[in-house]
Regions:
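Short amphipathic helix-loop junctions that connect adjacent transmembrane helices
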Residues: 36-50, 235-251
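Helix-breaking motifs and short loop linkers at transmembrane-helix boundaries and internal kinks
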Residues: 46, 78, 99-104, 246, ...
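Helix-to-loop junctions at the C-terminal end of transmembrane segments
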Residues: 66-78, 162, 266-279, 359-360
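Primarily marks hydrophobic transmembrane alpha-helices of the MFS/SLC 12-helix fold
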Residues: 80-83, 283
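Intracellular juxtamembrane helix-capping segments at the cytosolic ends
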Residues: 119-134, 318-331
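Symmetry-related core transmembrane helices of the 12-TM Major Facilitator Superfamily/SLC fold
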Residues: 172-190, 366-384
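C-terminal transmembrane helical hairpin of 12-TM major facilitator-type secondary transporters
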Residues: 277-324
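A late C-terminal transmembrane helix in Major Facilitator Superfamily
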Residues: 331-366, 371
Length: 395
């Protein structure tokens, strides 16, 4: 058996799929834990909204830089090595944030988290694509579902510690960060043992470097659109329900809960849909569901109908990202993934701020028409996506 065949067999194994699933879950748990800690961190350090925005911007800029470096290194030396090297940055970032007593230290923690998350995001998607190719059946939606589950667990740890330890406000930041860091360290130890080697992806022909394919920029445009649409659902759904339905903030949280739940559900089902209908069709219908959902929340004001609208949004946007990232990885490995993920990440990072400006201009109800239009654009662009289903079983 050749070395290439041996590597393919290792990537096709159940243990390889478990390893990548754990990567996504660990990354989601750290990001969810950090996001869940922000209100408490604000109380602990006495931060205002501008300082929070600065910290998040620094972390986001670090992530975008790490994506470019991590994507190229993943192709050059293997996505396994980059993924495992990124986790310590996440751990260090969580500990730094947890122990921070001044704003400057919190920024350092945010930058460490950004560096780790950016490199890991590209690399774990790259090795996920290789596992999918080796198994010859879709599995990327499943991986992304466990990122969402990990994020939910990380954010839910805030409530768990509050109940078990009776901690509130700034007092919860340090134990939360240390607990998340320990969980990530345990995950890293397991990943070191079970993660198989990933293939090296060359980008030269006869010694000449090949250009980034044109399709990468089309996928990047789609990532911009779904990044803003998904970011809006994550950051604005609860506020939208609260303001439009005229309910209290606790009830308004149904918006985000509904979006998150339906994203997980569709991602657990998504691979079966890809096997049956193909990625282009799944992306089209995902964008259609999301567009109808956003149109619904733009037109209605009753609580039940708003929940239905946000359910459609979650159901729709949950289909799109795993498929776009999978296509990017199949056509160009980590280098193309770095381009596409950067577009999506930038939109996810900056989109909610843009929506905030729009809300101030036209109101939160009518502002939701913008992501509806972007989702309509994804429907049009889906027909230009490269077909990568040929090597996957159609069942």
């Amino acid at each position: 058996m050749t070395a290439s065949a041996t590597l393919t067999n290792q990537l096709a194994s159940r243990i390889a799929a478990i390893a990548v699933t754990l990567m996504f879950a660990v990354n989601g748990a750290v990001i969810g834990g950090f996001g869940g800690s922000l209100p408490s961190l604000r109380d602990k350090l006495g931060l205002d909204a501008t300082q929070i925005a600065i910290m998040l911007f620094c972390g986001g800029a670090a992530a975008i830089l790490a994506m470019q470096i991590g994507g190229r290194l993943a192709d050059a030396i293997g996505a396994r090595e980059i993924t495992l090297a990124a986790v310590p940055f996440l751990i260090a970032g969580m500990i730094t944030v947890g122990l921070a007593t001044v704003f400057g230290v919190a920024i350092v923690g945010g930058i460490l988290l950004g560096l780790g998350n950016g490199a890991m995001d590209v690399a774990m998607n790259a090795i996920g694509v290789q596992v999918e190719a080796a198994r010859q059946r879709p599995i990327m939606s499943f991986f992304h579902a466990f990122w969402s589950i990990g994020q939910f667990v990380g954010a839910g740890t805030v409530l768990l510690l509050a109940i078990l330890l009776g901690l509130q406000g700034g007092a919860i930041v340090t134990p939360l960060s240390i607990l998340i860091a320990v969980l990530a360290l345990v995950g890293l130890g397991i990943l070191f043992k079970i993660t198989p080697k990933a293939a090296v992806v060359p980008h030269t022909i006869d010694g000449v470097k090949t250009p980034i394919p044109r399709a990468a920029w089309i996928l990047g445009a789609m990532a911009l659109a779904f990044g803003l649409s998904e970011g809006t659902a994550t950051d604005w759904s609860s506020l939208h329900v609260t303001d439009v339905a005229g309910v209290d903030p606790t009830t308004g949280a149904l918006g985000l809960v509904t979006v998150s739940a339906f994203m997980v559900i569709i991602r657990l089902l998504g691979d079966r849909l890809v096997s049956r209908f193909g990625r282009r069709t799944v992306v089209r219908f995902g964008a259609l569901f999301a567009a109808v959902g956003y149109l619904t929340v733009t037109l209605v004001s009753s609580l039940p109908m708003l929940v239905v609208g946000w359910a459609l949004v979650g159901f729709g946007v949950g289909m799109i990202a795993p498929q776009v990232y999978a296509v990017a990885g199949h056509i160009g490995g980590g280098r193309v993934l770095a381009v596409v993920v950067t577009f999506g990440y930038a939109a996810f990072l900056l989109g909610p701020a843009f929506m905030g400006f729009l809300v101030n201009q036209v109101g939160i109800h009518h502002a939701m028409a913008v992501p509806a239009l972007l989702c309509a654009g994804i429907i049009a662009l889906a027909s230009t996506m490269p077909r990568t289903d040929a090597g996957l079983s159609q069942r």
